[in-house]
């Protein structure tokens, strides 16, 4: 996704978003210190910038007021507003993000129908030396989740962070982060608890570390994570380590994933700074 501009007045931001929707361009608003306007389809960036310049010159033009009225009264060109949650899901998620989400859901359904152990026998980290050449096992543990809260929590973060990485940096970058963090976080976790674990959280922590540090060191990348959220991630690791909530957490995977993400972001930002 590409951030187009920011407005201090959220109503002005909404007026521009409404008008562009009538032109067939879908923009989204994210509220931070100001109302940030984001574009999912970057091929339309130049067109949006031209329209933005016109809008800034005369935001009170009747066509903008008409577009705002239309967004509240009709469906023409603005049906996305009836289902903003679904529209946001589509706009923020690329193919890799969706494939992983669907795989997690399908595996969760299978575990609910035929039992956790049956699925784990096929997807868990190698639990016997004879299985060490079944290469998929070093990665497929990320698809297994053991409760509804477990999968919802992980998929929400995966969509939010993985989608941003894929939209801004490409599917290849998301694949690399996912594969490397799945392998290394899984390796560390099996040293902590043995092979019977699962979940996307090691990868999620890698994405947290990557997005946060990449945003801090390379703001032009267009990805960022609020510092409050990275603090939350660290507190969650501490809570899991000391078992404050009485829940079984993959602490080794969380710590390893976070370190992997930070390291990858550091390397990538070094390369970016060398190019500039």
Curated annotation (Swiss-Prot):
The active site is at residues 201, 254. GO terms for cellular component: plasma membrane. NCBIfam families: PRK10907.1, rhombo_GlpG. It catalyses: Cleaves type-1 transmembrane domains using a catalytic dyad composed of serine and histidine that are contributed by different transmembrane domains. Keywords: Cell inner membrane, Cell membrane, Hydrolase, Membrane, Protease, Serine protease, Transmembrane, Transmembrane helix. It is a multi-pass membrane protein. Signal peptide: none annotated. The chain crosses the membrane at residues 94-114, 142-162, 169-189, 192-212, 229-249, 250-270. Its EC number is 3.4.21.105. The gene is glpG. It is found in: Cell inner membrane. Pfam families: Rhomboid, Rhomboid_N. It comes from Salmonella choleraesuis (strain SC-B67). PANTHER family: RHOMBOID PROTEASE GLPG, RHOMBOID-RELATED PROTEIN. GO terms for biological process: proteolysis. Belongs to the peptidase S54 family. Rhomboid-type serine protease that catalyzes intramembrane proteolysis. This is Rhomboid protease GlpG. One of its GO terms (molecular function) is serine-type endopeptidase activity. It is an enzyme of class 3 (hydrolase). InterPro entries: GlpG_N_sf, Peptidase_S54_GlpG_N, Peptidase_S54_rhomboid_dom, Rhomboid-like_sf, Rhomboid_protease_GlpG.
